[in-house]
Amino acid sequence: MITLTPGRLTLPQLRRIARENVQIALDPASFAAIDRGAQAVADIAAKGEPAYGINTGFGRLASTHIPHDQLELLQKNLVLSHAVGVGEPMARPVVRLLMALKLSSLGRGHSGIRRVVMDALVTLFNADVLPLIPVKGSVGASGDLAPLAHMSAVLLGIGDVFIRGERASAAEGLRVAGLAPLTLEAKEGLALLNGTQASTALALDNLFAIEDLYRTALVSGALSVDAAAGSVKPFDARIHELRGHRGQIDAAAAYRSLLDGSAINVSHRDCDKVQDPYSLRCQPQVMGACLDQIRHAAGVLLIEANAVSDNPLIFPDTGEVLSGGNFHAEPVAFAADNLAIAAAEIGALAERRIALLIDATLSGLPPFLVKDGGVNSGFMIAHVTAAALASENKTLAHPASVDSLPTSANQEDHVSMATFAARKLADIAENVANILAIELLAAAQGVDLRAPHATSPALQHAMKTIRADVAHYDLDHYFAPDIAVVARRVRERAFATLSPLSFESEQ
């Protein structure tokens, strides 16, 4: 059980929500603030004075006054008219994150929503009755309206859900969870729809995947150093301390740890090679820069996870209703775009190391890492696949946030495109997972060819993990299953856990 304290969520909590079947509960300490906010909205609605989002239309229709007897219909119509998403359903971890983030935002007490509505969301979450939310349809400003409308429609008994992974109607989902359809009161529909929770959930889910890919790339990169008989001198701490970037310093330390005790390295320590190619030698500099971007994005997304991104905002102590723009997801868009660049670069550097390993002139290994070249092509076309994926990522890494299209009759005339920025991270991450799988196979092949000299104790664990699924490449064979099985192990974090660098303790 994870207790959600609104405004104080942590990254470890969010990782568990995404990856484990943990249940959640709202911190009782938040109840008083929630109740004060709901009462403030009820008081404003009872007075009948115009207040945006409470008794007016929305967007360009904000100047339209809504009679008191139509306020409940207003909220229902808002939810139904905004449920216009298209595309495949959001993944289960993303929906779980989205619901938890929405509860945290509402739980700060500035949205004016009743506890009964929030309790229903908690009940659905814990019953594993998750709204079916189409992944496309948000521009990331005025909040993630369409995705959150699909979440909210389920509370009304409308739409579809997944009940323990099986698709069903929202009405059936409510029945399984022991709930009845809700009637939303003044502002509650808007409070549910306004917010950056969809884009933030997508970004967080992909952040966690990219963190694991980063750790895996440290392992594959270190293994490639030994496969290519590269030097460990470029990882000397003194070099990196002189530059001062934290990520570079930490990355270099990880490479030193992974390569410590390598007999391969000792065997060529006195060779006449002066410098390695950049893809080996500059790993701390490149991967350090990626690490800094990942950490920065994590910090931005954690702030957003704890934010109140509703509009308007209720301030119960003064009775004020303030319209602002906290729903604009530009911080999320920038964080996701920076993550995209970092993730693409992780894959691009790994592709260069694969190219180095298969080049006999650079690596000193048999051409394409296979004996009897000519009749055997070895890793020749596996590298082509890695190159194709790395090239694709260069297009996917183009920033989504540099684009904007006006919506709502130009009332909402600048938008963030954060949801797309966050969504395309999944495609980049999948490509990187496959590139790293190819590198791990190539590096393992190279290390085998360095026998009788062995790699380091830490990297021997990586070798055992690879060889448990894929044998040494002696002769050409149907290669695709080898890549697929190692890529699956990459996604399962089998190699990430071998890295001395961890994100788990970072908040």
From Swiss-Prot:
SUPFAM superfamilies: L-aspartase-like (SSF48557)
Pathway: Amino-acid degradation; L-histidine degradation into L-glutamate; N-formimidoyl-L-glutamate from L-histidine: step 1/3
CDD domains in the cross-refs: PAL-HAL
Keyword Disulfide bond on entry: no
Description of post-translational modifications: Contains an active site 4-methylidene-imidazol-5-one (MIO), which is formed autocatalytically by cyclization and dehydration of residues Ala-Ser-Gly.
Cross-link (5-imidazolinone (Ala-Gly)): A141-G143
Record EC number: 4.3.1.3
GO biological process: L-histidine catabolic process to glutamate and formamide; L-histidine catabolic process to glutamate and formate
Catalytic activity field: L-histidine = trans-urocanate + NH4(+)
Keyword entries, A-Z: Cytoplasm, Histidine metabolism, Lyase
Protein name: Histidine ammonia-lyase
Source species: Burkholderia pseudomallei (strain K96243)
